[in-house]
């Protein structure tokens, strides 16, 4: 199969599969000769900020000369973005090779009556094949959905776990309360393994604390009160993070205030791992300043920003940053996936910002929502002075 044919095949997987058990994923990895002891794993779950935290940690480890694999989702342009090794996405040739290796195992399993892996499970197996082949030492894994039953949660002895901010999302799968969703995310916490977590939502934080205590896992909570802004330029933020005995000034190359929490989670995680990695405080601070992560209040051109917020909490943070950055009434170009809670998203977008105009489009994907549906929702929420257009 060609690269294009492989991509088309993978995109078709959701149409004929459903999520499998962790035992199914373990069986697939075992047949690929992948073993947990080959990696030092940092496992990251949460509703928002997972990718950014992974990116900060990845940047520090790579700059220090470590062999690092980074598995994240979703991708922005091409699927190879999900598999990053030493700071660079895998090549198309490596992508094809990993697909062929996994497909061979999948064929064997199907011949024995076992189900085909789901979309995310398939990509996870491809990533693990690549990371093993390239002999990475540190492996940063971002969960796909939830935590407890996520395909990435097949490893029992990670080096460290991190849980970012938690909000209502995928309620039909994870539960319809913060407590339930936090419980699913906390499912990545392992016996005796340190966990760093965002404590800005006390309800979620208490669930995480209780889980950590039950697992005898050392835990470190990052509160909003521990963060203090020094300066925001529109491209960078200078701020201070204090955990009671360590005070550090950090500079991050992002204009969005929510990245302060993500950077602090990453800094605390790397501090906890300092004996393991040998990376000192000054090196951590310096490397974090060089972090790049696309699609998170990313300035593409002067006065043009991209943001991939996909739930109400993420969009609320997006709106907050628009209010701080915009010098005039801003224009919104908006689209969303069909399965997301677009009604709640539109409600948040209409509450706080007086948009000059709103342009609705469709993401070039079969899951993109019809702009006419979005238009109806914006019309129901808008005030008289707002204009809504569609493209």
Residue positions per predicted region:
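ATP-dependent carboxylate-amine ligase catalytic core
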Residues: 29-30, 34-37, 63-156, 172-174, ...
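Acidic, Mg2+-coordinating active-site environments of NTP-dependent enzymes
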Residues: 109-112, 135-142, 158-250, 263, ...
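Positively charged, low-complexity/disordered segments
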Residues: 389-391
